[in-house]
Amino acid sequence: MKTLIALAMLLYPAHPAYPAPPAYPALPAPPAHAAHAAQQPAKPQGKLFGTQDLGLLEAPDREQWQKPDQIMDAIGVAEGSKVAELGAAGGWFTLQLAERVGPNGRVFAEDIQRAMLDGIRRRMLAENLTNVTTVLGTTSDPRLPPGLDAALISDAFHEMDVDEDPQAVVKLLRNVALSLKPQGRLGIVDWTPGKGGPGPEAKNRVDPNRIIKAASAAGLQLIAREDFPPFIYLLVFGRANAKPTP
């Protein structure tokens, strides 16, 4: 039996594992007024990215293909900005945003899974960052504050756009639009249609035209599109009723 097991290990070596998400220190109990403490957990729709898979988002080469600085530049994230990330998951991009806006800025990290938000709070505590507020949203309302300079949905729209309720994502985007300043920007980053790369399988990738259609129905207009080969693309939206800056 031992010989058979050893032979199987030689013939079928283990696939190289993605790094596990870092272990962060335990958190003190959040204050009663914390943004997500008083909210009820949202009812998940479709297949959600679970906490057990967060290691997939921590690949050492992610910064190379995700292009966080270029994305933040495109949606106007600067020192002192007030921004939000929807579907923040493990907080990889939340960390990028928090470092960019600095101590005078504020990042609202939204997710519909409480466990994700707890992980983000631990991560920010470990990084000694105090400019991040977690927000427990729903599939149709991210519960964001008004006056945002920018909002970001990074590699998560394909999970928000579900067949069970096709209007939920339109309602979600409409609520984002209401939270933006007149000249605020929404960036949506998702996986280039087709196969390959670290993203979801081809059938779960979203054609950018589908996103543009949903955003238009939500009162947003496309301002710019940029492709970041080989894995992702970026769509930048503004409020359709916003008056141009003089």
Locate predicted features.
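Hydrophobic beta-strand segment of the Class I
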Residues: 83, 151-152
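Short glycine-dipeptide loop
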Residues: 79-80, 103-105, 180-186
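A short acidic, Gly/Pro-enriched loop at the edge of an enzyme's catalytic core
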Residues: 140-151
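Class I SAM-dependent transferase core
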Residues: 33-84, 92, 118-122
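A short glycine-rich, Lys/Arg-flanked "PGG" loop and its adjoining helix->strand segment in the class I
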Residues: 98-99, 167-185
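Core SAM-dependent methyltransferase catalytic element
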Residues: 221-224, 228-246
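Class I SAM-dependent methyltransferase SAM/SAH-binding core
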Residues: 84-142
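Conserved class I S-adenosyl-L-methionine
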Residues: 117, 185-212
